[in-house]
Amino acid sequence: PKLLFEYIDGAASDGSGEAENRRIIRHFRLKTKALINVEQRSLNHKVFRIPTKLPVGIAPMGMVQMAGVGADEEFAKFASKYEIPVGVSTAASMSLEKYAEYSRGYAWFQLYYMADKAELEKLLNRILMAGYKTLIFTVDVPEIGFRPNEIRNGLKVPFKFGPKQIFDFALHPAWSLKTLMNGAPKFGNFTDTNSFNRGASRAGADWDFLRYLRDHWPNKLVIKGVLNTDDAINMK
């Protein structure tokens, strides 16, 4: 359906950030060296000292079940097959426990700022109990971005159906029938749809919160979204 395609394919605001990222990436070049024996070669790598079979990982993405039934499970199984990290979004449409199971331990949980310390500690304990060794804390989204595609198409989670959405779904029967048989995508880590607000402010995140998180999380902690060298140095 159009509203889901534009959610996946689109970008925030006028798309200038995405365009700038693409422009920069196009300027990267690989410089090869000649006359080096490469009969024995491997893509094996280490990501934060964790051995992997590929020098990549799968970024955390919320509600990927909207793209297709079983999408979360496929991501987790792919991570297991190639022994690469898969980021589990707080807003994932499959539970963090199932991600840990299907990925065979290659899942890293991505956490947003939470003002409620009691709920945060409850979630951290749940993540630990599921066997997670790495936590990703997102710091570059203090407020949710302006997403005109979602506003224009009326995309909301949980799904709210109106004439526009029903007409869109009717034009894509394969997706609609499969989704109807399996149920509308929902947040996999929260049984109460009101317990997680995708658009909630995360503006309260600060250095004190990071220290608090470091004190309450015993395993590896990855900070996602650091764009300033001074911040990176301070985080060491």
Identify the meaning behind each predicted range:
Residues 122-124, 227-236:
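Catalytic cores of alpha/beta
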